[in-house]
Swiss-Prot record:
Cofactor annotation comment: Binds 1 Mg(2+) or Mn(2+) ion per subunit.
PROSITE patterns linked: IDH_IMDH (PS00470)
Biological role stated in the UniProt entry: Catalyzes the oxidation of 3-carboxy-2-hydroxy-4-methylpentanoate (3-isopropylmalate) to 3-carboxy-4-methyl-2-oxopentanoate. The product decarboxylates to 4-methyl-2 oxopentanoate.
Record key words, sorted: Amino-acid biosynthesis, Branched-chain amino acid biosynthesis, Cytoplasm, Leucine biosynthesis, Magnesium, Manganese, Metal-binding, NAD, Oxidoreductase
Native organism: Vibrio vulnificus (strain CMCP6)
Protein name: 3-isopropylmalate dehydrogenase
Amino acid sequence: MTDKTYKIAVLPGDGIGPEVMAQAHKVLDAIEKKHAIHFEREEHDVGGIAIDNHGCPLPQSTVTACEESDAVLFGSVGGPKWEHLPPNDQPERGALLPLRKHFQLFCNLRPAQIHSGLEAFSPLRADISGRGFDIVVVRELTGGIYFGQPKGREGEGANEKAYDTEIYHRFEIERIAKIAFESARLRRKKVCSIDKANVLQSSILWREVVEELAKDYPDVELSHMYIDNATMQLIKDPAQFDVMLCSNIFGDIISDECAMITGSMGMLPSASLNESKFGLYEPAGGSAPDIAGKNIANPVAQILSAALMLRYSLGEEAAAQDIENAVSQALAAGELTADLAGDKPALSTAEMGDKIAQYILNS
């Protein structure tokens, strides 16, 4: 049987990006050995290193490589070296936002969970974190109040005013809700849709459309929750949630809250998808230039981003689960990088990558 081949554009970027990406490569190598899969991988410049080498944060050659690939595995961009540049020329705004726009990445997926043995890092009370949680926030990324028109400021003195417009079209709600329901089918089959339908017209439409779409997913349990209650319930009982479906602004709030209650940002991957399931996969954290090159960064978020890539863009669920299980095994065995080890001996970035790859091969 011939191996399935996937073409991956690998964009390590700046700061800790290259060293954590090297660990994702090790894990993908292990997946190739275990499964009938081959990854054709090419690395390309993005962010600050692209400014240094090409004069701009997102060279056309990088965009072309992404267009010719099945998915993009992204590291991190930015650092003090480029902060003097105009905002639109800086690595973050000049690379990530144009990539999202170019590929019409309307859906952001942010998993958040407490891994066994890491409960103490959560700011939640021990009896709450001890129950564990495993949530995926499905956030609409291109609509809503951040992009709705009109927006602006006018007037002066006491009559000066500013305004933004929350707009959602039926098709925007349908396509993001579809991803939430399909994600739930791969998990515990529960979707909680977050809105403010007691006040906002956009939320009333949101709820109506989600209810209609739910009829196509009779195996998935749908519930609704107002955003203000949802932020409280995440603190009180996060274990009740499986997939949380959110508009742009509500998802912005909820995904950051979910990240914080895990207590370990270095562990959190994210995915941004378009309608054809093409995606950009990246750690939720930043480029951490203060620890770059020291071989101490936690590579788990980058490795789990590769697992999301396998699941959502490539449809390789078994391989994705192998990576996630290997990460869980390493953490449960107390194999931790410096950000989590505390007083115990810490693994280096490279050692953590080696451990996780070995767990995959041994499974």
